[in-house]
Amino acid sequence: MSNGVNAPLARHAMAYVLAGGRGSRLMELTDRRAKPAVYFGGKSRIIDFALSNALNSGIRRIAVATQYKAHSLIRHLQHGWNFFRPERNESFDILPASQRVSEELWYLGTADAVYQNIDIIESYDPQFIVLLAGDHIYKMDYEQMLQQHVEQGADVTVGCLEVPRREASGFGVMAVDADDVIHSFVEKPANPPPMPGKPTMSLASMGIYVFDTKFLFEELRRDAADPNSSHDFGKDIIPYIVKHGKAVAHSFDRSCIRSHAEAASYWRDVGTVDAYWAANIDLCDIVPELDLYDHNWPIWTYGEIVPPAKFVHDKIGRRGEAISSLVSGGCIISGSTLRQTLLFTGVRVHSYSTIEQAVILPYVDVARSCQLTNVVIDRGVRIPEGLVVGEDPELDAARFHRTDAGICLITQPMIDRLEA
């Protein structure tokens, strides 16, 4: 973990996290919460990864801009990220959209979400702004990116990674020269340009940017005065700097935190139900690509005070057991079997049930004799006795949200309709 001695640039930086998006492709999972507040990995929220990266990198001033259905997110931040101390020059600010610039406007775009809070940022006088998206899963040392930004004299440094070209239309895509200077940038192109020598890959923006604070404010004020701008970093700010200034690409491979030297870099969008399910289930592997057990780069979060998980009953056909699964505190597995399943806090599984490849959010109650396969179950759902999911695709699609890959998202309103 970086600290104030070996991370001098980070101690002069503020991390500004954009956490206002809904994440509509997650369907009903974001009906009640913003995407950054969605649960991940057994006990965390998605936003905890960006925040933990900032903290572990040595950054001690953090701000989070919120907008869409922010209550769950704000409550989590208040509970889990309240340990910053002003007397140590630390700060943690939650910045809901509050019509600070105009009484008629909320945040109009990602750039506007920073512009409306310029006065708050100025009060802390950071030298650098590390601008982050709050809805991705990855581990990264931002100090490395700050160092490249300073060494190359960049106006903006953009975090980037290689993605399959067929997936690149959802990203900002760039082209760079031998010195990593960006000479073209297009946001979410319909036909993403390939990388030289790699026709199936594109170089994509991670939505992570480093700016000198003074330069950023100048650009935000210029953009705010442009009536033709959508006030978005990817669509407006970055392309303008590429054309009129110096934009540099920072490869994620240079600063990602790996579980071991040979490990591949890990970054996930988890923006769809399928991707969300897969990234959680991957954690059940013997050696998962994402290492949550790394004490040198912990993922900080709010931990409820709950008792240990408990497994009860040991009879043939009624044995409480879990194979290749993650089971969080407060769970009780009563005479049922879990395989490749991830349970969040406080889940109760009653007897004679079999659950396979499931992601079950906190405080779900699964009644007796259920067979659940390839499911994501939202927080607090009460699964009725004898429910079978994962065996009849047509029936599943009629009752729940079933993806093309066969993953069923189950919420309480869906269960209520079954019982009506």
Swiss-Prot record:
InterPro entries to which the protein is assigned, alphabetical: ADP-Glc_PPase, ADP_Glu_pyroP_CS, GlgC_bac, GlmU/GlgC-like_hexapep, NTP_transferase_dom, Nucleotide-diphossugar_trans, Trimer_LpxA-like_sf
Coiled coil: none
Catalytic function, reaction form: alpha-D-glucose 1-phosphate + ATP + H(+) = ADP-alpha-D-glucose + diphosphate
GO molecular function, one term: glucose-1-phosphate adenylyltransferase activity
Example of a GO biological process term: glycogen biosynthetic process
Pfam families reported for this sequence: Hexapep_GlmU (PF24894), NTP_transferase (PF00483)
EC primary class: transferase
Keywords: ATP-binding, Carbohydrate metabolism, Glycogen biosynthesis, Glycogen metabolism, Nucleotide-binding, Nucleotidyltransferase, Transferase
EC numbers, comma separated: 2.7.7.27
PROSITE patterns: ADP_GLC_PYROPHOSPH_1, ADP_GLC_PYROPHOSPH_2, ADP_GLC_PYROPHOSPH_3
Classification via HAMAP family: GlgC (MF_00624)
Subunit structure as annotated in this protein's UniProt entry: Homotetramer.
PANTHER family membership: GLUCOSE-1-PHOSPHATE ADENYLYLTRANSFERASE, GLUCOSE-1-PHOSPHATE ADENYLYLTRANSFERASE-RELATED
Function according to Swiss-Prot or TrEMBL: Involved in the biosynthesis of ADP-glucose, a building block required for the elongation reactions to produce glycogen. Catalyzes the reaction between ATP and alpha-D-glucose 1-phosphate (G1P) to produce pyrophosphate and ADP-Glc.
Family to which the UniProt record says this protein belongs: Belongs to the bacterial/plant glucose-1-phosphate adenylyltransferase family.
Protein name as annotated: Glucose-1-phosphate adenylyltransferase
The species this protein was found in: Rhodopseudomonas palustris (strain BisB18)
